[in-house]
């Protein structure tokens, strides 16, 4: 059964909305990645902050206020007419909500704990529900008056990629007629300092797949799709998932789990490696991830595939990254937003790591060559791996 991504709302360091984000994506715009003090003591790493104006928060929804939900509401605003039409067509019980996140409410919880440490009491109006991982999905369902399946997924950096796979299963199994799916994550000090403690944060713009790579940049963002059976221009053809069970934070260096996920995605989509016209790499610019992903990509695509990491443009948006980068694949395949068939260019210093297989990294002149399928990879702590494949419909 085909599942179509029939509406897309998104915002990140590249901007807000499909048109603005597409312009920045295909220009390789890194201007949203700015050195930012205040997150990590005595450091100013580049951070991908959403600077677009966010909707005023409705007073009646004050108990649900968080930065995550603000970003989510902004993404919803872009596609709300299509969502309301789906609710009218199918009814609120037949619309599901599946969202991925990893920082849901952590910032609000940190602020509350800080007040409690000083005063012995939580601040007035503090809501424990703000820090639940299901909070974004719960807010969205309540806001829209939906009563279909509603849940959140949190598998670190594969969270929202898994949300898209889970949403597709809800359609295939007949539990829903439409699903709002995607991911959202916002910046928070606990997360940034946690990565800093792992010595994984770069002091400069991240440099994926370079011999000089030295760590990640963190960003925030939201991407929200309306997934339905009604035919549309872009389909979620399938996906694959695997688990390394290798290490709590490091990937299996052989790339075994990543290979399994990519091969499973190809099988589920009925495609061969040569059918993929663009691969969005996870490409965090850490020594371990990029080494593993280079090996895995070479195993699955021995003849090569045009590919790039978009992390230098947005930062690593963690639980939102899978959905956000699926959105980048969506924009790449959309002939209206990308009439020239541009591919997102790789932004790096151009110095390949001689210890790794050479990848066919894109540049400003790279174009789709007629193959209308794109794969997006997401790999996470704990060895969680997800690959998604999107396709442009004839």
Show where each model-derived region lies.
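N-terminal amphipathic, basic-rich helices that act as targeting or association modules
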Residues: 1-5, 65-81, 87-92
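ACP-dependent fatty acid/polyketide chain-elongation machinery
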Residues: 1-62, 101, 229-239, 327-347, ...
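Condensing-enzyme catalytic core mediating Claisen C-C bond formation in acyl metabolism
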Residues: 2-8, 26-37, 42-46, 201, ...
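Conserved small-residue
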Residues: 7, 25, 97, 140, ...
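Glycine-rich phosphate/pyrophosphate-binding beta-alpha loops
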Residues: 13, 103, 156, 284-286, ...
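Short acidic, glycine/serine/threonine-rich loops at helix termini
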Residues: 16, 108-112, 190-194, 246-249, ...
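Conserved catalytic cysteine-centered active-site region
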Residues: 33-77, 104-166, 175, 191-193, ...
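Structural signature of cysteine-dependent C-C bond-forming condensing enzymes
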Residues: 85-96, 114-125, 139-149, 172-179, ...
């Amino acid at each position: 059964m085909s599942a179509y991504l029939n509406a897309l709302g998104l915002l990140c360091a590249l901007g807000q909305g499909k048109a603005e984000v597409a312009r920045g994506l295909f220009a390789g715009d890194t201007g949203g990645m700015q050195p930012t003090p205040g997150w990590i003591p005595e450091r100013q790493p580049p951070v991908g902050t959403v600077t677009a104006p966010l909707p005023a928060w409705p007073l009646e929804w004050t108990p649900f206020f968080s930065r995550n939900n603000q970003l989510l509401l902004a993404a919803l605003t872009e596609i709300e007419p299509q969502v309301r039409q789906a609710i009218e067509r199918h009814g609120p019980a037949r619309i599901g909500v599946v969202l991925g996140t990893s920082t849901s409410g952590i910032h609000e919880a940190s602020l509350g704990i800080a007040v409690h440490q000083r005063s012995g009491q939580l601040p007035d109006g503090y809501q424990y529900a703000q820090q639940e991982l299901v909070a974004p999905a719960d807010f969205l369902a309540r806001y829209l008056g939906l009563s279909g399946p509603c849940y959140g997924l949190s598998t670190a950096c594969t969270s929202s990629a898994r949300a898209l796979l889970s949403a597709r299963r809800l359609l295939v199994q007949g539990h829903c007629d439409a699903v709002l799916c995607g991911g959202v994550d916002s910046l928070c000090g606990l997360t940034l300092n946690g990565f800093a403690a792992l010595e994984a944060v770069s002091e400069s713009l991240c440099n994926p797949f370079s011999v000089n790579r030295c760590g990640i940049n963190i960003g925030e963002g939201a991407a929200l799709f309306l997934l339905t059976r009604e035919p549309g221009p872009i389909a979620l053809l399938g996906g694959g998932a695997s688990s390394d069970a290798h290490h709590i934070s490091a990937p299996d260096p052989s790339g075994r789990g990543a290979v399994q996920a990519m091969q499973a995605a190809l099988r589920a989509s009925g495609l061969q490696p040569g059918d993929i016209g663009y691969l969005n790499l996870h490409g965090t610019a850490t020594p371990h991830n990029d080494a593993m992903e280079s090996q895995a990509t070479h195993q699955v695509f021995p003849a090569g595939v045009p590919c790039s990491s978009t992390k230098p443009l947005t930062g690593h948006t963690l639980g939102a990254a899978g959905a956000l980068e699926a959105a980048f694949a969506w924009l790449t395949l959309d002939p209206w937003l990308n009439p020239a068939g541009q591919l997102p260019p790789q932004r790096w210093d151009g110095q390949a790591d001689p210890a790794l297989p050479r990848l066919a990294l894109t540049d400003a002149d790279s174009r789709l060559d007629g193959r209308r399928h794109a794969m997006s990879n997401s790999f996470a702590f704990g060895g969680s791996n997800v690959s998604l494949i999107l396709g442009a419909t004839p």
